[in-house]
Every structure is written in structure tokens, then in C-alpha cells.
């Protein structure tokens, strides 16, 4: 038997060992989209695959994603082009903004939702194909956009009833030159204690030393207590920017914790970074994360240009976040479960010999009532159809037998009470007679 590939899961109409029912996904997505609409953000739909160099340049060659987690291959062109299933959405969104000149005279605020792909060890809430909501705001260097995005996520948590189970952690990475100075000081400090670092941190010391700050190894974390602090290397502008963000968050009533070791796993961030974390899923888990990436647009614009022309490329400010929907749905179901929705409101049961009349009735009802979901079973026995009606979750079952067709009536059964009455054939066509 052919099965789905490890880490690539079906999302069905029923719960499985690896996924919640599709009806819960739809409700979750609808609630998130409502908040996005309220803030005036617009949807974009991006390709699943991009050129590999886009992610290598944007995310960083030394990151875990590029080094170990990307699904990459070549296409059939001549010469072949290296392409990659997208491991995240920001790089593709920035590519689209550049390619279509969306920044010309505008400051677009965009969102996208869909599958991402990373070659990781599958575990609960973390799969090789997973789903993200990504939100990006372009063209503003002001801290108010960062506060707006955090306020948006906070509103989403409130609507989902999980705001008390999430904690906001924030930090400032400063500008590139400030981060480089800190990087040098951190490496110099850790080189003297290299043998005490865990194996992964020893490797990162030469490839991506800032990621050592995010190590989960307790001995490494103990060493970092004595290490230089990034905050001590921030210039006045970066410090003022961060203080303004904290002022805005306080005014919004959003509690936060400054985490000096929060650096994020992608190279393109500068200044503000943030994460929403929870311990409700076992060990502390990140549900949503983001930050500012003012240099990424210029970096991607310069691809293929000479060194002199690349230096002349103007970058644009940008900030965004992404949230993993599998993990978010797990949290929602643990704290404030989404109520399962039935597949239909009205189930039409019809004598097998009268199936054409049943089809016509169901279709006329759908045309008259766009608010109703009307379902029919195949032309099996009445008994078999009634069993399906019982399982459907419908509020009403409409029964069409020979007597009803001849008299122009229908039998309407209220499913939760079992009461069954005869009504005019067009009774359900009027919202005055039956409302959801």
C-alpha cells in the first residue's frame, strides 16, 4: 500500500493521529483572516518553489535551515536551475515585492498562508510539510509598525481565547555594525571556553555564533551568563527605537519580557525581534515569531549585480512575523477547543425511485437559501439514508416519499428532538420559517 511520505500529513474531515479535522482548520484560518482584514492587510499567494539562491542569500548560508533542512533539487532546464521547496515565506514575499515594483509610491502590508517545507525530525506540532501564516509590512522604519504587528497577534490570541497562555519575549539586535562588534566580542569570549560548549555550539562558533545564545544546553547557558551582552553594543538610535517599542507595548496593555538571548534563527533580522512562547505544549514552544529586516530588500536587489552596482542599491525597511498553524491549533485545542461543525444543516432523504425529484428539491433549496448547507446521500434505501442523516450533524432532515411528492409537501424531522412534522414543500425556502 502506498502511504504519505514521512512528515507529510493528510488533513482530513476527521481527526487523525497527526492532524486536527479540516473543519477546525477552516475556523482557525477564518478567525485569523478576520483580524488581518481589520488591520487592512492584503493577501498575496506565492509559489511553493523558488530558486535556491534566494533562500541561501536571504536566510543565510550558515543557518540550520540552509545547511540541513531545505528540500532542494534541480529542474529540467538547460542548464538546470537549483530550486527549493520554500522553507519560509519572507524571502519569497520580498522577491515578489521587488519583482513587481510594489514599493513604488506605496508601503504595502501583506499576508500569505500556506505550506512550508523543512527536512526535520517529525514530532508533535512539527512536520516536514507544515503551514504558516506570514505577515509583512514594507516601507516604514518607524517602531509603530512593529507595535501594530504585535498588537495584531495579541488580538488574534484574545479572539482564540489563548492570550493568557502565551508570553511575549522581545529583544533588539541593533544594526549590522553593532551586531558585528558584538559578534567579535562574543567569539573572543567563547573561544577561551570552547571545550565547555556543547557539540552544536562548538560548530556554530565558527559558522553562526549568535545562535549559541539560543542553545538549550544548560552548561552552555551557564557560560553565557558571563558573556558580553548585546545590549551593551547598541548605539543610541537602536536603544531609542527599542525603548519606544516598550513604551507602545505598555500603552497597549501588552505584557512583555526582554530576553537578551533572543536572536532568531534567520540572518536577515535587525533591531526588533520578538517571539510568542507557551509552555502549555510541554517544553517551551514558540508559536509566533518575527522582527525587523531592513537590509533584506537591498540584499536581494543586489543579486547578480557587480560589486559597485550592488553598493548603490537602495534598501527599504520592512518588518514581519510568521506563526506555525499546526502548533497554534494544538494550543487552541488544549486551552479553548474549537467546536466541531457539522458538514451540513439540512439533510435530504428521498425514496430511491424519486431521486430526481430529490435532486431538484435540494438544488432549489440551495438556490433560495445561500446560508444553508444541504446534503444528499446516494439513491440507497431510506433506512440507509436515515443512518447517514443521523451521522451528518444536520439540524433538520427533509424526507421526500411518494405521498409528499404527490401532495406538494415535505416531512421535516428536527434531529435533536426527533419531532417530525409535515410542511409545505417551500417552507424551508423562507428564512422566516427556519434560521440557523
UniProtKB/Swiss-Prot annotation:
<keyword id="KW-0067">ATP-binding</keyword>
<dbReference type="InterPro" id="IPR006195">
    <property type="entry name" value="aa-tRNA-synth_II"/>
</dbReference>
<comment type="similarity">
    <text>Belongs to the class-II aminoacyl-tRNA synthetase family.</text>
</comment>
<dbReference type="InterPro" id="IPR004516">
    <property type="entry name" value="HisRS/HisZ"/>
</dbReference>
<dbReference type="Pfam" id="PF03129">
    <property type="entry name" value="HGTP_anticodon"/>
</dbReference>
<dbReference type="GO" id="GO:0004821">
    <property type="term" value="F:histidine-tRNA ligase activity"/>
</dbReference>
<dbReference type="InterPro" id="IPR045864">
    <property type="entry name" value="aa-tRNA-synth_II/BPL/LPL"/>
</dbReference>
<protein>
    <recommendedName>
        <fullName>Histidine--tRNA ligase</fullName>
        <ecNumber>6.1.1.21</ecNumber>
    </recommendedName>
</protein>
<keyword id="KW-0963">Cytoplasm</keyword>
<keyword id="KW-0436">Ligase</keyword>
<dbReference type="GO" id="GO:0006427">
    <property type="term" value="P:histidyl-tRNA aminoacylation"/>
</dbReference>
<dbReference type="GO" id="GO:0005524">
    <property type="term" value="F:ATP binding"/>
</dbReference>
<dbReference type="Pfam" id="PF13393">
    <property type="entry name" value="tRNA-synt_His"/>
</dbReference>
<dbReference type="InterPro" id="IPR036621">
    <property type="entry name" value="Anticodon-bd_dom_sf"/>
</dbReference>
<dbReference type="InterPro" id="IPR041715">
    <property type="entry name" value="HisRS-like_core"/>
</dbReference>
<dbReference type="GO" id="GO:0005737">
    <property type="term" value="C:cytoplasm"/>
</dbReference>
<comment type="subunit">
    <text>Homodimer.</text>
</comment>
<keyword id="KW-0547">Nucleotide-binding</keyword>
<keyword id="KW-0648">Protein biosynthesis</keyword>
<keyword id="KW-0030">Aminoacyl-tRNA synthetase</keyword>
<dbReference type="InterPro" id="IPR004154">
    <property type="entry name" value="Anticodon-bd"/>
</dbReference>
<dbReference type="InterPro" id="IPR015807">
    <property type="entry name" value="His-tRNA-ligase"/>
</dbReference>
Amino acid at each position: 500500500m502506498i502511504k504519505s511520505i514521512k512528515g507529510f500529513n493528510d488533513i482530513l474531515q476527521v481527526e487523525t493521529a497527526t492532524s486536527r479535522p479540516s473543519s477546525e482548520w477552516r475556523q482557525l484560518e477564518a478567525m485569523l483572516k478576520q483580524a488581518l482584514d481589520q488591520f487592512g492587510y492584503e493577501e498575496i499567494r506565492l509559489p511553493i518553489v523558488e530558486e535556491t539562491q534566494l533562500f541561501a542569500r536571504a536566510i543565510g548560508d550558515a543557518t540550520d535551515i540552509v545547511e540541513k533542512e531545505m528540500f532542494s533539487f534541480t529542474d529540467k532546464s538547460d542548464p538546470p536551475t537549483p530550486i527549493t521547496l520554500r522553507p519560509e515565506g519572507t524571502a519569497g514575499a520580498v522577491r515578489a515585492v521587488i519583482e513587481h515594483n510594489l514599493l513604488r509610491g506605496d508601503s504595502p502590508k501583506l499576508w500569505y498562508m500556506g505550506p512550508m517545507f523543512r527536512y526535520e525530525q517529525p514530532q508533535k506540532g512539527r512536520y516536514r510539510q507544515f503551514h504558516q501564516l506570514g505577515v509583512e509590512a514594507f516601507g516604514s522604519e518607524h517602531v509603530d509598525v512593529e507595535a501594530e504587528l504585535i498588537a495584531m497577534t495579541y488580538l488574534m490570541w484574545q479572539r482564540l481565547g489563548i492570550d493568557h497562555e502565551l508570553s511575549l519575549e522581545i529583544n533588539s539586535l541593533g544594526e549590522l555594525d553593532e551586531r558585528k562588534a558584538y559578534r567579535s566580542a562574543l567569539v573572543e569570549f567563547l573561544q577561551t571556553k570552547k571545550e565547555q560548549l556543547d557539540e552544536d555550539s562548538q560548530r556554530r562558533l565558527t559558522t553562526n555564533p549568535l545562535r549559541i545564545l539560543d542553545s538549550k544546553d544548560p552548561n552552555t547557558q551557564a557560560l553565557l551568563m558571563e558573556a558580553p551582552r548585546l545590549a551593551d553594543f547598541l548605539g543610541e538610535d537602536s536603544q531609542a527605537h527599542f525603548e519606544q517599542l516598550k513604551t507602545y507595548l505598555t500603552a497597549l496593555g501588552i505584557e512583555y519580557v526582554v530576553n537578551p538571548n533572543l536572536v532568531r534563527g534567520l540572518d536577515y533580522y535587525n533591531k526588533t525581534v520578538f517571539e510568542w512562547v507557551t509552555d502549555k505544549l510541554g517544553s517551551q514552544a514558540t508559536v509566533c515569531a518575527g522582527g525587523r529586516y531592513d537590509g533584506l530588500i537591498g540584499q536581494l536587489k543586489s543579486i547578480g549585480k557587480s560589486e559597485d552596482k550592488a553598493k548603490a542599491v537602495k534598501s527599504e525597511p520592512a518588518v514581519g512575523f510568521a506563526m506555525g498553524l499546526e502548533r497554534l491549533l494544538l494550543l487552541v485545542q488544549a486551552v479553548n477547543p474549537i467546536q466541531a461543525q457539522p458538514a451540513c444543516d439540512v439533510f435530504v432523504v428521498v425514496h430511491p425511485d424519486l431521486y430526481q425529484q430529490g435532486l431538484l428539491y435540494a438544488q432549489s433549496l440551495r438556490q433560495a437559501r445561500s446560508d444553508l448547507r444541504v446534503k444528499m446521500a446516494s439513491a440507497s434505501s431510506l433506512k440507509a439514508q436515515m443512518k447517514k442523516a443521523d451521522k451528518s450533524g444536520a439540524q433538520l432532515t427533509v424526507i421526500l416519499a411518494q405521498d409528499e411528492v404527490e401532495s406538494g409537501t415535505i416531512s421535516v424531522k428536527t434531529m435533536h428532538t426527533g419531532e417530525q412534522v409535515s410542511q409545505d414543500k417551500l417552507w424551508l425556502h423562507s428564512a422566516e420559517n427556519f434560521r440557523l
